[in-house]
Regions:
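A short, mixed-charge helix-start or loop-turn motif at secondary-structure junctions
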Residues: 13, 37, 107-108
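Cofactor-binding active-site loop characterized by glycine-rich and histidine/acidic residues
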Residues: 41-139
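Cofactor-/ligand-binding subdomain signature composed of acidic, glycine-rich
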Residues: 1-34
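Asp/Glu-centered strand-loop micro-motifs enriched in Gly/Pro and often flanked by an aromatic residue
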Residues: 33-42
Length: 139
């Protein structure tokens, strides 16, 4: 399994498109495993799996900031940022929250968010801060 060897999005950079498709399949399986055994949100996570793999392949998180519209889309992101075990191993599922959380991973989770409609304001704030600080990262 590829997903067990992914500690950060940088690990995706060397994979082929075919291998990235396998990663997406493994992520979807991990989401279903977690939700079946622990509860959580299925649709938003499954629906955004390929997009999350693509975002992490193209951009350079954590330098580039990725903001999700709803935290219910964050399971694939969590799996690609070193937290796959919380989706694959039933004994580790309590270690992962159902939402993005800087307490869980301050490097990749910029905000503690839950529901929708905060993403535009959060991304705008990150952009403004980047511009004030003279940064070059993508938001």
């Amino acid at each position: 399994m590829y997903i067990e060897k992914i500690d950060s999005p940088k690990d995706l950079k060397s994979l082929s498109i075919e291998q990235l498709n396998v990663v997406a399949e493994e992520v979807r399986s991990g989401v279903l495993n977690r939700v079946s055994n622990h509860g959580g949100h299925v649709g938003p996570n499954l629906g955004f799996t390929e997009a999350t793999v693509a975002l992490h392949y193209v951009f350079n998180a954590p330098e580039d900031k990725i903001v999700f519209d709803i935290s219910h889309q964050s399971y694939p992101h969590k799996m690609l940022t070193g937290r796959a075990k919380g989706f694959l191993d039933v004994n580790d599922m309590d270690a992962i929250s159902g939402y993005s959380s800087p307490l869980e991973n301050p490097e990749y989770d910029n905000f503690e968010i839950g529901h929708t409609s905060t993403s535009v304001a959060l991304a705008s704030g990150l952009q403004k801060a980047r511009d004030i600080m003279g940064g070059k990262e993508n938001v």
